[in-house]
Amino acid sequence: MPEGIHLTSMSELLTFEEIVQVVRTAAELGISHVKLTGGEPLLRRSLPTLVQMLKNIEGIEQVTLTTNGILLKEYLPTLLKAGLDAVNISLDSTDRDTFRKITGFDQLDMVLAAIDAACASGIRTKINAVSLDLGEEAMWNLIDLAKDRPIDVRFIEMMPIGHGKDFPVYSHTKMLELFKERYPDLTADKAMHGFGPAVYYHIPGYQGSIGLISAIHGKFCDKCNRIRLTSTGFLKGCLCYNTGADLREILRANEAENEKRRHLTETMEAAIYAKPRAHCFESAEDVTERATMNEIGG
């Protein structure tokens, strides 16, 4: 977690019941997959209860979680019982010192234990690593997590949002060239790995796969099927812009429930149809979003 972040009071956060109202409306509008992200979602007390509540909504086919992994092993049995379908674990380095510098905590062992626990449980597991220029050895060590584990190790181009603006974007074109040099038998993996934009590759002899999510150098906005709901109830169509809709204001309005449901549906539908055609991260002056990723969720 970066230093100097804005801490949100509990009164500003959507309650579980309010989140369920939004997701139920989203399901009525045709959305079927939900991912709980952060910040760190497992810091939210009783999160497995929310997972179960979301799984019980008609039309919701899948609920997944993105976590830093530190609390995952502890909560995994309860999450599985609640019906969690898959988990993404954020891990940028397997080197203890580098991990501590990035996260501020010396808890790499807990994350690695969580990865093994997730694999042992059978839940679909992916590793999300932001593509930082930490040297080739760091990259190979991350990829080797997929050697004896049935997981996807995915490299994600740094998004120039919040603290991400302070880092150069590490090109996946260069990264793929390095992959092919080290693994000459690397092949494209055409198997279905989910509903996201990652392009996957397989190394012979490895149980898992490698994925590249190239938001900057491999722009996939024409295929983007996502909207984001912040913890405070703001619905966003694109990470690049500060546009969207304040759903918390509607959820807490003093009006009849049927009017509130109608207002919520109309507002969400309008926000979805107003989703920008493409991001503008190539042109920094056009980016209007000022929040950090931990505030937005991702």
Model-flagged regions — what are they?
Residues 97-100, 105-209, 215, 249, ...:
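Radical SAM enzyme [4Fe-4S]-AdoMet core and its adjacent flexible, acidic
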Residues 1, 76, 103, 239, ...:
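Short, flexible helix/strand-to-coil boundary loops that buttress conserved ligand/catalytic motifs
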Residues 219-298:
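Radical SAM enzyme core and accessory elements
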Residues 1-15:
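Canonical Radical SAM [4Fe-4S] cluster-binding loop centered on the CxxxCxxC motif
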Residues 210-212, 237-238:
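Short capping micro-motif at the N-terminus of alpha-helices
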Residues 13-36, 43-156:
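Radical SAM/AdoMet-radical enzyme domain recognition
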Residues 8, 45, 73, 162-163:
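Short, solvent-exposed loop/turn segments at secondary-structure junctions
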